[in-house]
Amino acid sequence: MYKLIIRPILFWFDPEEVHYFTFSFVKFISKIPGVSSIIRSIYEVKDSRLEREVFGIKFKNPVGLAAGFDKDAKLYKELSDFGFGFIEIGTVTPVGQEGNPKKRLFRLKEDQAIINRMGFNNGGVLEAVERLKKNSGVLIGGNIGKNKVTDNEDAVKDYIICFDALYNHVDYFVVNVSSPNTPNLRALQDKEPLTALLQTLQNRNVEKQKTSTQKVKPILLKIAPDLTDEQLLDIIDIVKTTQIAGVIATNTTISREGLQSSNQSETGGLSGKPLTKRSTEVIRFLSEKSNKAFPIIGVGGIHSADDAIEKLNAGASLVQLYTGFIYEGPALIKAINKKVLGQL
């Protein structure tokens, strides 16, 4: 139904406007008594064999929603009804910001892809915190970044502000230094500044745990697919040095290789089917070269259950959807979970 009727209608309109409309619509129908239960009965796969413990957290299934879809934690409860095992909110920044000028989101239908240059548009971390205070039972990741106006030399302060604010309201953290849409952000992926940033956050993590009843919160690093093998080896060293919990591989790419759509010349990060192979290569490289020293969440171009299985077999412990969710609809979540069960 989604691919035959709903998607063709939605794809007639501007993608960013459709995104906001979809949020409002799902929020509205979920308030109708019984609708959430019906959605869960259609899409949720309940089976204890899907459960897995990764970086000390028990996930009810291995399929999550990637950051960028529910930036401000407005719809995490309703989205979880579609069968996701976890929801990653953000990227959030210390102060709310508009992001880059519109138009900034483009479909590449021929390539089953999206280009975005959103630029960390969000209402600010405190706005997200207020919504997360109402959470009851949804496993949440907090993806954190820096404000556009913050120089890289001061970036650590922005990450600490977001970390402190979200600490009691998320289950794990993701440090985003790999978006191509904030000027100079990717420079923070270089070994020296990245080690310093992650070590500072990890030190803060240990400090906060001492005054909390909670365990140390897992901190993950989200990396770009455009890193060289040498840079990926640096990432492995950094994870081991700072003792963060793991890596999310990968963010969007700046590559435009093999695209057919007329929108391919738009600047921004490319996600979707063209990223499938490269993100899996990065997962396999990190897993093999590190001797599976840390967990990896695989994301990038998952448009089918087979795509997800390929990433899990390459070394990912969990997977996340974004563009595949838009192109394939919520049935993809159920298909992946059923395929995982079929592989057992």
From Swiss-Prot:
Keyword ATP-binding annotated: no
An MF annotation (GO) of this entry: dihydroorotate dehydrogenase (quinone) activity
Cellular component terms (Gene Ontology): cytoplasm; plasma membrane
Entry keywords, A to Z: Cell membrane, Flavoprotein, FMN, Membrane, Oxidoreductase, Pyrimidine biosynthesis
Enzyme Commission number(s): 1.3.5.2
Binding, FMN: A67, G68, F69, D70, K71, T91, N143, N176, K222, T250, G272, G301, Y322, T323
Coiled coil regions in record: none
Topology relative to the membrane: Peripheral membrane protein
Main location: membrane
Catalytic activity: (S)-dihydroorotate + a quinone = orotate + a quinol
Binding site for substrate: K71, N116, R117, M118, G119, F120, N176, N181, N251, T252
Gene3D superfamilies: Aldolase class I
Broad class of enzyme this protein falls into: oxidoreductase
Catalytic residues (positions): S179 (nucleophile)
Function, in words: Catalyzes the conversion of dihydroorotate to orotate with quinone as electron acceptor.
The family this protein is said to belong to: Belongs to the dihydroorotate dehydrogenase family. Type 2 subfamily.
Protein name: Dihydroorotate dehydrogenase (quinone)
Organism (species): Flavobacterium johnsoniae (strain ATCC 17061 / DSM 2064 / JCM 8514 / BCRC 14874 / CCUG 350202 / NBRC 14942 / NCIMB 11054 / UW101)
